[in-house]
Every structure is written in structure tokens, then in C-alpha cells.
């Protein structure tokens, strides 16, 4: 069988980059499940989103680094390796993903497809009538490499997150959503501007330079007839 040497070189280069990555090392040291924790950390520090006592929904939660970060914001830190959160949580975290989720104390997890109405109904049930302060979406589709197809898949997930946010966020609540630069990006920004009073695009330092991902942050739901959102 012929071996694709180019593919082997790419995989080896990725592995080398990964094991020497500053954020990978930091995540291991601080007890996070992935380097993605530092993406939401920077977004939170930039925008001031997450505070004790809130209700936070984490969409596309696996492996759980974002939920871990929120949990640490909701609980005291014990002295020890990684500064892991300990004690009773002051807040509610609900995580959802298609894939299995390693249990995390204080985090309610629902496994299922956010695109399915039955799963969405279960998620709403877990809220138990409480409005949401922050919706986090790190959801991403399986990419085909066909730009038009991928743009449509990305847009669909963003639109679903927007619909959920519009229905369940508090008036001053916030949505953080992963998007990708390319076809359809400007339309997604426009949708955020129509929905939120303040819209920010944040590319965290922990997001790899070669990655097209960025994060749209919408803060404060608009009422009909309000002027266009401020954008940064």
C-alpha cells in the first residue's frame, strides 16, 4: 500500500506544534481538559461576562474545558495544584454535546444533537424556568472542504444558538459563538448586530494563528426598533 508521505509530514508537524504549545502545557499544569479554556478565559476577561450566581449554558461542551472555567468562576479555589474549584457552586452550569462528557461536579450534562427539537426541549427542561445569563457555543460542524456547504453548516449552528439565546437569555445576557472567517461571515455578524446591542469579534491568543476561527460576542438583547448595535 502506498503511504501518503505529505499527510504523514503534516500530522507529525501538527503533533510537534501541539506538544510544544504554551497553552497545552498550561492546561496540563492547571488541570484543564484542553487549551480551549484559555480562549473563554480571555473572552471573559475582555468582555466581563461570567460572574458567580449566574445560569450558564455551554453548547458543544466536550471535552469540558469551558465548563471547567465557568465552574472555577462559580466556586472557591482550593490551595493546590491547578487551583481546582472546590466547595458549593454559586451558579448553575448546563452543558450539551453530541459526544459523551466526562462528569464534572456541579455541571448538568445532556448528550444529544442541539439541532433536534426533542433535545432542545430537554435542555429547556433542565433550566426549570430560569432565564439564562450567558450562552457559550463552541459548536462546529464536520467540515467537508466545500466552502458553500461548510458556510451553510456553520450558519445553521450559529442561527440555532441565536434562536436559543433570543428565547432564553435575560435582557442583559450574552452569547459567545464560534464562527469562521470566510463565506457567510459578514452575514453572521449582521445577524448578531440585529439581535444584540453590543457586538464584539474576539480572536483569543489561544486560538491558533493559522485557524480561521473567531468568536462573536453579543451582549444585551435588542428590542424591536432599537438602533444598530455598537461593534468592536
From Swiss-Prot:
EC category: transferase
Catalytic activity: uridine(2552) in 23S rRNA + S-adenosyl-L-methionine = 2'-O-methyluridine(2552) in 23S rRNA + S-adenosyl-L-homocysteine + H(+)
Its EC number(s): 2.1.1.166
Predominant localisation class: cytoplasm
Subcellular location: Cytoplasm
One Pfam family recorded for the sequence: FtsJ
Function: Specifically methylates the uridine in position 2552 of 23S rRNA at the 2'-O position of the ribose in the fully assembled 50S ribosomal subunit.
Entry protein name: Ribosomal RNA large subunit methyltransferase E
Source organism superkingdom: Bacteria
Keyword line: Cytoplasm, Methyltransferase, rRNA processing, S-adenosyl-L-methionine, Transferase
Active-site residues per Swiss-Prot or TrEMBL entry: 178
Single GO MF annotation: rRNA (uridine-2'-O-)-methyltransferase activity
Gene3D superfamilies: Vaccinia Virus protein VP39
SUPFAM superfamilies for this protein: S-adenosyl-L-methionine-dependent methyltransferases
Protein family per UniProt: Belongs to the class I-like SAM-binding methyltransferase superfamily. RNA methyltransferase RlmE family.
GO cellular component: cytoplasm
Entry binding sites for S-adenosyl-L-methionine: 64, 66, 97, 113, 138
Organism expressing this protein natively: Leptothrix cholodnii (strain ATCC 51168 / LMG 8142 / SP-6) (Leptothrix discophora (strain SP-6))
